[in-house]
């Protein structure tokens, strides 16, 4: 902000918070089943991400079907190297696949999405991985990249079309997770 202000002193600045759209989620959707003090004292809860995208897509869908956004119940998907799903009821986010961080949820280009929370403990114990290494593994070496060695969906689709089993698996795992979230939001 300071650099932009120095470089463009006469240009208004606007801050957009990617999590803001998800602030309408009910407590049952944003709270984790962990001790209450972790939420109250440390803010450990689900925040969601890609809110600007989900809000735009929801409003655009409402326009296309000719219905006020506030009367729409929708499931929106943000699909790219980062990916998320959001349930919208009456124009408000009521659930989303990403949690406290973007790591939770759908399979992404390099992020694993949902996994058993004990997997990092297992990897730490059996492989001696520290927190920094685990964070890098789950955020930057997993997802599509971890499943098939590539995080470009166009290349993965091409490889799958050519019979590459790892690429087929990556597409299958991604589709399974998408169907799981969409089904939960119906």
Which residues does each PLM region occupy?
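Conserved phosphate-binding loops in N-terminal lobes of ATP-dependent enzymes
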Residues: 1-15, 19
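Alpha-helical scaffold segments in soluble metabolic enzymes
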Residues: 3-6, 56-64, 119-123, 133, ...
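Short, glycine- and charge-enriched coil/turn segments that flank and shape catalytic ligand pockets
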Residues: 10, 64-71, 126-132, 160-166
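Short glycine-enriched loops at secondary-structure junctions
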Residues: 19-22, 141
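Glycine-rich phosphate-binding loop of actin/hexokinase-like ATP-binding domains
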Residues: 23-126
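Conserved active-site and cofactor/substrate-binding residues in soluble primary-metabolism enzymes
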Residues: 48, 52-56, 83, 114-118, ...
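Beta-strand segments within the central parallel beta-sheet cores of soluble alpha/beta enzyme folds
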Residues: 71-77, 132-141
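Adenine-nucleotide phosphate-binding core of ATP-dependent small-molecule kinases
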Residues: 136, 140-149, 153-186
């Amino acid at each position: 902000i300071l650099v932009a202000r120095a470089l463009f002193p006469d240009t208004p600045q606007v801050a957009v918070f990617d999590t803001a759209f998800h602030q309408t989620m009910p407590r049952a959707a944003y709270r984790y089943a962990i001790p209450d003090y972790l939420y109250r004292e440390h803010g450990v809860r689900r925040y969601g991400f890609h809110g600007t995208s989900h809000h735009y897509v929801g409003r655009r869908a409402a326009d296309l079907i000719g219905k006020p956004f506030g009367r729409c119940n929708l499931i929106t998907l943000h699909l790219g190297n980062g990916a998320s799903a959001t349930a919208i009821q009456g124009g408000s986010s009521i659930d989303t696949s990403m949690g406290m961080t973007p790591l939770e949820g759908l399979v992404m280009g390099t992020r694993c999405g949902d996994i058993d929370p004990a997997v990092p403990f297992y990897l730490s114990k059996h492989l001696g991985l520290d927190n920094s290494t685990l964070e890098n593994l789950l955020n930057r070496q997993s997802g599509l990249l971890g499943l098939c060695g590539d995080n470009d969906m166009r290349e993965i689709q091409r490889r799958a079309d050519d019979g590459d089993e790892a690429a087929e698996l990556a597409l299958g795992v991604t589709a399974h997770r998408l169907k799981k979230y969409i089904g939960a939001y119906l």
